[in-house]
């Protein structure tokens, strides 16, 4: 990768973001980090090679060789090794429960034997695996046993003193920690490699059931004497069988110590699963443990993310490399396995009603049609801007499911509503005529529980727009503080208390509701899904930080600046349902305000055409200019841009099929104070006005197209059913499963959807 040889402080080669320090040693620091491409948390052991002597350097590379060799569910996995001129970075699996020493210290008299048996059996299982590979650990102690609470496992770590051995041959290096080292190591004699690990296992078991080390005196000299004499006292509460096993392991003579086979077959360890981790396959020992479908989907995702091409990925896996390619592959693969196993556990333990709720609120761990992913990413090149992790994160919701909330919180990500489906468009209302009384437009989200409350207020709404979500795997809808209007929309099931905490929310808001579209709308949704497929990128909450970075740069190039992170470009401004095009765009390249001539302002006349008829006179795809002769109209245009951008963020598309030169401006200036929105003074948005017979298209910011050419084929059918969609002045639009209602009233003082009068505005509460 291009960034692989750049600086390693803060961000390792653009692959990992370093965070807080988890621990320190003589030559190394262990830091919490986040893998940028996948978002997974890892532990990074940073070793300063400038402080190492020749012997320590040898131990360092021996540790790396041994950790590459041992891959077991009860051993912390090594994902990647990054070697620089001055530092060595070991990318390791991150435990979530601390080490065993701290856990033991919380129990003065030790753990109950059933729990101690469970943990000790896992440690024995891991050491037995190492010895079968002729690897000796030589530094077994509770500090080097890490808890993985979510998996219910303990795992060995820190192979800094490990080494390969040959059966029958002795080792000579004295290493380890005093309180846990076998007598023969402390004496400096040659020793049998497996026997020293057996001694350390005895010390660990003693600590588990007694709460303190067997050999720990006031000073090292006294401790050494106790070890050499093998003097220790087992408390009376320890069972006879457990005491016998401890005695079998803590033997002064290595030849008299129990072997690992004898330990595994000891009566005290009977009836316990030696390794529950074998049920999880996490960490993934080999890519061959994955199905062909999972394997291919991960490779495809890495290729789309510019990690490497397919041949390079396969070659790295087959040769057991420990580079950024294999690290990314296994982090993605393990997430798939973890999500699948958690889902299986929830399915077995949950009631039918809970299962239904989980299905509604979760994402699938994989997909069966890789073509969906390709359509997803090619629809919006913004996902590929500058950083390699963006496309993989955008595909994350499709392949791996929703990320855990803890991850999202740690990254401090702001999520926007996920809308998987084609860009939205509107069908004009059947009738929209000016009125004389001063009224306000109410923008609200409806729910059945609060309809009665809404009815109590005498309001004459000239039209009502119902926006409907299309079914999708991304059915989580969360609030966003930075979007001034859209932050009133929140997820089904979210508490009202949390919702009320936002001080900037308007008083008249209610929750989302589920309802069924009219037959015409259902027919329309079917045709859109059949002809166009998915148009948005299905980016997940995981994409907010990195993807927003690239999008802000794109917005800057287009002449716009905002105080919030934008969503995918597919959620751009709108076109009409009838013509399939009609998307808003900046007024000019420099972001200045276009001014229309008086003849333009007065041309055409008349009221907006109805959804089923009308006589539009403008050319298909023509963008009309909205400006007035005074400074107040420029201010109104700027305010209109604020609201349009807010609507843009949730893929709310407002299109209009109007007569000749009818003006269509939205002005929220007098209704809400958008303190969080900052639009350049000369920036304005022009709404698209298209004829009913053609599929005019106007590019949005960045020039991205959201509608396929074949949308024009459905125009006739859509025109035929418009009268049904517009029945009772309700305009129904497909969103994704949920319904948003926009009630619009015209304010003659401000103007609303006015025909030939000065530029009109609508008021949003």
From Swiss-Prot:
The modification Phosphothreonine is found at residue 173. SMART domains: S_TKc (SM00220). Its cofactor is Mg(2+). Autophosphorylated. Phosphorylation on Thr-173 by STK11/LKB1 in complex with STE20-related adapter-alpha (STRADA) pseudo kinase and CAB39. The modification Omega-N-methylarginine is found at residue 534. Belongs to the protein kinase superfamily. CAMK Ser/Thr protein kinase family. It comes from Homo sapiens. The keyword Isomerase does not apply. It comes from the Eukaryota. The lineage of its organism: Eukaryota, Metazoa, Chordata, Craniata, Vertebrata. InterPro entries: Kinase-like_dom_sf, Prot_kinase_dom, Protein_kinase_ATP_BS, Ser/Thr_kinase_AS, UBA. This is SNF-related serine/threonine-protein kinase. GO terms for cellular component: nucleus. Residues 549-558 have a biased composition (Basic and acidic residues). It is an enzyme of class 2 (transferase). ATP binds at residues 22-30, 45. PROSITE patterns: PROTEIN_KINASE_ATP (PS00107), PROTEIN_KINASE_DOM (PS50011), PROTEIN_KINASE_ST (PS00108), UBA (PS50030). May play a role in hematopoietic cell proliferation or differentiation. Potential mediator of neuronal apoptosis.
């Amino acid at each position: 990768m291009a960034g692989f040889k750049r600086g390693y402080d803060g961000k390792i080669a653009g692959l990992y973001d370093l965070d807080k320090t988890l621990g320190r040693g003589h030559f190394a620091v262990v830091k919490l980090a986040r893998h940028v491409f996948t978002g997974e948390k890892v532990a990074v052991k940073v070793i300063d090679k400038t402080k190492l002597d020749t012997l320590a350097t040898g131990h360092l590379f021996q540790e790396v060789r041994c950790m590459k060799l041992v891959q077991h569910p009860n051993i912390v996995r090594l994902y990647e090794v990054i070697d620089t001129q001055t530092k060595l970075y070991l990318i390791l699996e991150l435990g979530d429960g601390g080490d065993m020493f701290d856990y033991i210290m919380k129990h003065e008299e030790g753990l109950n034997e059933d729990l101690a048996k469970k943990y000790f059996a896992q440690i024995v299982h891991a050491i037995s695996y190492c010895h079968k590979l002729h690897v000796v650990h030589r530094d077994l102690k509770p500090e080097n046993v890490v808890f993985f609470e979510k998996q219910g496992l303990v795992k060995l770590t820190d192979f800094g003193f490990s080494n390969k051995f040959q059966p029958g041959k002795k080792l000579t290096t004295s290493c380890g920690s005093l309180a846990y080292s076998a007598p023969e190591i402390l004496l400096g004699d040659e020793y049998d490699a497996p026997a020293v690990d057996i001694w350390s296992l005895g010390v660990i078991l003693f600590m588990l059931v007694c709460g303190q080390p067997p050999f720990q005196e006031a000073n090292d000299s006294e401790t050494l004497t106790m070890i050499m004499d093998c003097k220790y006292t087992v408390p009376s509460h320890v069972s006879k069988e457990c005491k016998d096993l401890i005695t079998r392991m803590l033997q002064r003579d290595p030849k008299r110590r129990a072997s690992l086979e004898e330990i595994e077959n000891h009566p005290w360890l009977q009836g316990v699963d030696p390794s529950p981790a074998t049920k999880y396959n996490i960490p993934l020992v080999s890519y061959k443990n994955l199905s062909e479908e999972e394997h291919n989907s991960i490779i495809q995702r890495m290729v789309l993310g510019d990690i490497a091409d397919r041949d390079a990925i396969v070659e790295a896996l087959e040769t057991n490399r420990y580079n950024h390619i294999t690290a990314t592959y296994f982090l993605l693969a393990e997430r798939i396995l973890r999500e699948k196993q958690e889902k299986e556990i929830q399915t077995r333990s949950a009631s039918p009603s809970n299962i239904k709720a989980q299905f509604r609120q979760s994402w699938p761990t994989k997909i069966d049609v890789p073509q969906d992913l390709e359509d997803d990413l090619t629809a919006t090149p913004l996902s590929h801007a500058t950083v390699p992790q963006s496309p993989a994160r955008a595909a994350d919701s499709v392949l791996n499911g929703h990320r855990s909330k803890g991850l999202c919180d740690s990254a401090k990500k702001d999520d926007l509503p996920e809308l998987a489906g084609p860009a939205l468009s509107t069908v004009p209302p059947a009738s929209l005529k000016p009125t004389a009384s001063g009224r306000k437009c109410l923008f609200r989200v409806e729910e059945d529980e609060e309809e009665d409350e809404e009815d109590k207020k005498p309001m004459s709404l000239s039209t009502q727009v119902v926006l409907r979500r299309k079914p999708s795997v991304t059915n989580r809808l969360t609030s966003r503080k930075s979007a001034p209007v859209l932050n009133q929309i929140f997820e089904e099931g979210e508490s009202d208390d949390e919702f009320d905490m936002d001080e900037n929310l308007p008083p008249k808001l209610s929750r989302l509701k589920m309802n069924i579209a009219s037959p015409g709308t259902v027919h329309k949704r079917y045709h859109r899904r059949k002809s166009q497929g998915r148009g948005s990128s299905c980016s997940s909450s995981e994409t907010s930080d990195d993807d927003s970075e690239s999008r802000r740069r794109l917005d800057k190039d287009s002449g716009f600046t905002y105080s919030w992170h934008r969503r995918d470009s597919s959620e751009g401004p709108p076109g009409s349902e009838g013509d399939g095009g009609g998307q808003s765009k900046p007024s000019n390249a420099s972001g200045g305000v276009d001014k229309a001539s008086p003849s333009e302002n007065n041309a055409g006349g008349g009221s907006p055409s109805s959804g089923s008829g009308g006589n539009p006179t403008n050319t298909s795809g023509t963008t009309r200019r909205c400006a007035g002769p005074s400074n107040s109209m420029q201010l109104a245009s700027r305010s209109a841009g604020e609201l349009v951008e807010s609507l843009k963020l949730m893929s709310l598309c407002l299109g209009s099929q109007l007569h000749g030169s009818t003006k269509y401006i939205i002005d929220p200036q007098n209704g809400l104070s958008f303190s969080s929105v900052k639009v350049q003074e000369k920036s304005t948005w022009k709404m698209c006005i298209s004829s009913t017979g053609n599929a005019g298209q106007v590019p949005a910011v960045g020039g991205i197209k959201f509608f396929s050419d074949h949308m024009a084929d459905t125009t006739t059918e859509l025109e035929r059913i418009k009268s049904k969609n517009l029945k009772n002045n309700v305009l129904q639009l497909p969103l994704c499963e949920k319904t948003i209602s926009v009630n619009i009233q015209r304010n003659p003082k401000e103007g609303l959807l006015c025909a030939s009068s000065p530029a009109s505005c609508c008021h949003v509460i």
